[in-house]
Design a protein with these regions (language model features):
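Structural signature of FAD isoalloxazine-binding scaffolds in flavoprotein oxidoreductases
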Residues: 1-4
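A cytosolic small-molecule/anion-sensing beta-strand core signal
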Residues: 49
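Long, positively charged amphipathic alpha-helical accessory segments at protein N-termini or as interdomain linkers
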Residues: 9-11, 15-45, 55-195
């Protein structure tokens, strides 16, 4: 699903919309799981920096931003029906159908999921436009996977390792590297070490 937005904030703050969208997807996924599974059956769900939604260790959604003139296209893909098992960025894909009671029976319809997603996206987008990245960052960190854990980050041809220490106000991963320096990671593929 792609949504065209015309943010009223400066362009250098548009990065935050990937965090906004991932929070919206996460909330809808959790809501769907809570409706159909007992609390004991609900697998771990969370956010993987910078923009993936993870359920039971698998990637259920990713977010892509694209600037188009004075607008921003927010693309969100969510796996509802079963997906082909391929290793993508060190995370195996997963779909709601993989953890749904009775398999794919009574899965949410894409239209219903999209409607719920657009509602949550509007909520978080409004909050961002009114209050900035701070509240988005705080909520994202509450749901972050690998925070405080030792990770490896593939940045182009280089691999950095250290502890995922924090999320910068510019959306960067703050990595306390093995030499004790804080690195500001702007892009990369994150993998938990020792797992």
């Amino acid at each position: 699903l792609s949504v065209l937005l015309r943010p009223s904030v400066p362009v250098d703050q548009w990065f935050a919309l990937s965090f906004v969208a991932s929070l919206a997807v996460l909330e809808v996924v959790r809501s769907q799981l809570a409706t159909h599974l007992s609390s004991a059956e609900i697998p771990q769900t969370g956010l993987k920096w910078p923009n993936d939604v993870i359920v039971a260790g698998g990637k259920i959604s990713g977010i892509l931003l694209e600037v188009e003139g004075k607008a921003l296209i927010v693309g969100s893909g969510v796996n509802i029906a079963p997906v082909r098992r391929v290793d993508s960025q060190n995370i195996v894909p997963i779909a709601l159908a993989d953890i749904w009671p009775d398999g794919a029976h009574d899965l949410p319809q894409p239209y219903d999921f999209a409607t719920a997603y657009l509602d949550r996206l509007a909520f978080w987008y409004d909050r961002f436009c009114q209050s900035g990245f701070g509240p988005i960052r705080d909520t994202w960190l509450e749901n972050a996977l690998f925070l405080g854990q030792h990770v490896a980050v593939q940045c182009d041809a280089k691999v950095l390792s250290g502890v995922f220490h924090d999320l910068g106000m510019d959306g960067t991963m703050l990595l306390l590297d093995d030499s004790g320096q804080t690195r500001h990671i702007t892009t990369g593929d994150v993998k938990l070490l020792g797992s």
